[in-house]
From Swiss-Prot:
One of its GO terms (cellular component) is plasma membrane. Keywords: Acyltransferase, Cell inner membrane, Cell membrane, Membrane, Transferase, Transmembrane, Transmembrane helix. The lineage of its organism: Bacteria, Pseudomonadati, Pseudomonadota, Alphaproteobacteria, Hyphomicrobiales. This is Apolipoprotein N-acyltransferase. PANTHER family: APOLIPOPROTEIN N-ACYLTRANSFERASE. The gene is lnt. Pfam families: CN_hydrolase, LNT_N. Catalyzes the phospholipid dependent N-acylation of the N-terminal cysteine of apolipoprotein, the last step in lipoprotein maturation. It comes from Rhizobium leguminosarum bv. trifolii (strain WSM2304). The active site is at residues 291, 355, 408. It comes from the Bacteria.
Length: 534
C-alpha cells in the first residue's frame, strides 16, 4: 500500500491531471443508477494521495502554496461533474436546431464552474494538512462546507453532492434525518478517505478505527430507524387516503410542438385518471398529474374544467401541474408561473401554489437584457420566461391533509424546507424529467427526492411525466412506483402519521457541529505533527 501511495504522490504533469480527472469520474459509479458506493473509497484514497503530492515552494506566498491543491481538487471535480451531469445535454437535443450550440457549455462549461467548489474544498483542506488522520478530517470539513456553499451560492445547484454516494439504499439514508445530506457528505468524505491512511502509516490505526466506527454508526442508526418506523403511530389501512399517480410518458418534443394536439395530451391524462382501480382496490381520493401536465392556460379554458369535473367523482381531488397566467394590466406583460392547481370534483380550482426556485437558462434568463443581445434564450419558450413566486405555502386539501409542494428540481435543495414543513403531512413533488430521456438524470433526481423524505420524516408523493413516479415513506422506502418511460398509473395509500417531522434548524445545527469537530480533529492533528517536527 505504501508503494502504491508513493507512486501516486510522485506522479506529475499530464499523468497527474489525468489521474485526478479519472478519480473524480470513477466516483460517479456510487450515484444512481449504479449505486456502487465502494467506488468512492478508491476515488477519495487517490485524491488524498494526490493532495499529499500537491507541494509548492514555501516562498510562493499563500495563493502559490495552495494553487497545486486547488488545481488537484478542480480536476477531480471536473471529472466528477462531467461524468455525473453529461445527461444535461439531452435536454438541449429536444430542440437541437435551437440549442445544440450550447452542448459544450452544458457538458463541459457547467462542470468546469462547479469544479471550482471542489478546488476550494481541497485548497481549504490543504491549510490544515498534516501527515495523519487530520488531513482526512480537513478534507471532509472542506467538502462539507463547499457542498453547502454550492447549494446556496447564486441560485444554488447541489445536484450529486458527495453524500448521495453514501446513501444508495434506505438503510444508508437514515443519518440524513439527523445531520442532513450535507452532514452525510462530510461523514462520507472522512470514511471514503480513510484507506489513504494505510499508505502513509502515520495515524493509520486511530484514523481507520474512527472511520470504521463512524461507518458502523451510520449503518447502525439506519437499521434502528427502519426497525422502529413500522411501530410508529399510524392510521388503519382503510382510513388512509388513496393517491393515484398518473404517468402519461408524453415525449418532450411533442409537448413543445406548437402544432401538437393539446387536447389529445389532455385526454390522455383524463383517461388514466378514470381507469378502474387494479385488483379491486378502492377508488383514489387524490389524483396527481405531473409538472405542466395541462397543455394550455386552464383558467382560460372552461371546457377543460368541465371535462375534469366529468371525470372526477364529487369527493375526489385532482392535483395538476400547469402554467398559470397573471394579467398585470394595460401596458404590462403577462406574468407566467410554473404552478400546481388543486381542483375539486365540481371542476373548481380550490388551491394553487407557484414555483419559487426557477431553473436558470431553463425557466428564466439571468441578465436577460444583456444575454438576449447575443441571441441567448430560455430552453422553455415562454414570453419573458417564468416568474418566480415570492414564497410557497402548504396546499390544504379537504379532509385535513396538508401537502408541502415542490416543483421539479426544488426537491434537491435541503434548505427549501421552511418552518411550515412541521404542519405538512407529506411532501408533494411533481416534475417532468422527459427532458432527459433514459439517462442517469431522472434516477439521480429521484434519489435526492427520497433523501428529502428521510430528512423531514415525511412521506413523499412524487409524480413525473416520464418517471420515476412513486409513493415513498418517511424512511425513503418505495411503497409503489412506476419506472422510467412507462405509461400508466399507480394507486397507493399514504399514511398521514410517519415519524415526527423535524425542522431545518436541528439538522443545520448538527451539520455545523460535525464541521466544527472535523476542523478540531484537523487542528489537533496538525499541532501534533508540527510539534513532532520541532
Amino acid at each position: 500500500m505504501e508503494r502504491l501511495a508513493d507512486r501516486v504522490i510522485l506522479v506529475w504533469g499530464f499523468k497527474r491531471s489525468l489521474l485526478a480527472i479519472a478519480a473524480g469520474a470513477f466516483a460517479v459509479l456510487a450515484l444512481p443508477p449504479f449505486g456502487f458506493f465502494a467506488a468512492m473509497f478508491l476515488s477519495f484514497t487517490l485524491l488524498v494521495w494526490l493532495i499529499d503530492g500537491a507541494a509548492a515552494s514555501p516562498d510562493s506566498g499563500l495563493v502559490g502554496r495552495l494553487w497545486p491543491a486547488f488545481a488537484t481538487g478542480w480536476l477531480f471535480g471536473f471529472g466528477y461533474f462531467v461524468a455525473g451531469l453529461w445527461w444535461l445535454g439531452h435536454a438541449l437535443l429536444v430542440d437541437q436546431d435551437e440549442f445544440a450550440w450550447a452542448l459544450p457549455l452544458a457538458i463541459l462549461g457547467l462542470p468546469a464552474c462547479l469544479a471550482i467548489f471542489y478546488g476550494l474544498a481541497v485548497a481549504l483542506a490543504r491549510i490544515f494538512w498534516s501527515d495523519g488522520m487530520g488531513r482526512i478530517a480537513a478534507l471532509a470539513a472542506g467538502f462539507g462546507l463547499m457542498e453547502w456553499l454550492r447549494s446556496v451560492v447564486l441560485t444554488g445547484f447541489p445536484w450529486n453532492a458527495i453524500g448521495y454516494g453514501m446513501m444508495p439504499v434506505p438503510l444508508m439514508m437514515q443519518s440524513a434525518h439527523v445531520i442532513g445530506a450535507m452532514g452525510v457528505t462530510a461523514l462520507a468524505v472522512f470514511v471514503f478517505s480513510a484507506p489513504a491512511l494505510a499508505g502513509t502509516r502515520q495515524g493509520a490505526r486511530n484514523g481507520t478505527a474512527l472511520a470504521v466506527l463512524l461507518f458502523a454508526a451510520h449503518l447502525g442508526y439506519g437499521a434502528y430507524a427502519l426497525y422502529v418506523a413500522p411501530r410508529a403511530e399510524a392510521l388503519p389501512e382503510d382510513k388512509r387516503p388513496v393517491v393515484r399517480l398518473v404517468q402519461p410518458d408524453i415525449d418532450q418534443a411533442a409537448k413543445m410542438d406548437n402544432d401538437a394536439d393539446r387536447n389529445a395530451i389532455f385526454e390522455t391524462h383524463l383517461k388514466l385518471s378514470a381507469e378502474t382501480p387494479k385488483n379491486g382496490g378502492r377508488k383514489p381520493d387524490i389524483i396527481v398529474w405531473p409538472e405542466t401536465a395541462i397543455p394550455f392556460i386552464l383558467t382560460d379554458n372552461q371546457d377543460a374544467l368541465t371535462r375534469i369535473a366529468d371525470t372526477l367523482d364529487d369527493n375526489q381531488i385532482l392535483i395538476a401541474g400547469a402554467v398559470r397566467a397573471e394579467e398585470m394590466g394595460p401596458g404590462t406583460p403577462t406574468r407566467y408561473y410554473n404552478s400546481i392547481y388543486v381542483i375539486d370534483g365540481r371542476g373548481q380550482i380550490i388551491a394553487a401554489s407557484d414555483k419559487v426556485h426557477l431553473v436558470p437558462f431553463g425557466e428564466y434568463l439571468p441578465f436577460e437584457d444583456l444575454l438576449t443581445e447575443f441571441g441567448i434564450q430560455n430552453v422553455v419558450e415562454m414570453p419573458g420566461g417564468f416568474s418566480a413566486a415570492v414564497s410557497r405555502h402548504l396546499l390544504a386539501l379537504p379532509g385535513g391533509l396538508n401537502l408541502y409542494p415542490l416543483i421539479c428540481y426544488e426537491i434537491i435543495f435541503p434548505d427549501e424546507m421552511t418552518s411550515d414543513i412541521e404542519d405538512a403531512n407529506a411532501i408533494l413533488n411533481i416534475t417532468n424529467d422527459a427532458w432527459f430521456g433514459a439517462t442517469p438524470g431522472p434516477y439521480q433526481h429521484f434519489q435526492q427526492a427520497r433523501v428529502r423524505a428521510v430528512e423531514t420524516g415525511l412521506p413523499l408523493i412524487r409524480d413525473a411525466n416520464s418517471g420515476i413516479s412513486a409513493i415513498v415513506n418517511a424512511q425513503g422506502e418505495i411503497i409503489a412506483g412506476l419506472d422510467l418511460e412507462q405509461t400508466g398509473f399507480i394507486d397507493a395509500t399514504v399514511d398521514r402519521f410517519g415519524l415526527e417531522a423535524g425542522t431545518t434548524f436541528p439538522r443545520q445545527t448538527y451539520f455545523w457541529l460535525t464541521e466544527a469537530l472535523l476542523i478540531l480533529i484537523a487542528l489537533v492533528s496538525r499541532r501534533g505533527f508540527i510539534s513532532g517536527l520541532n
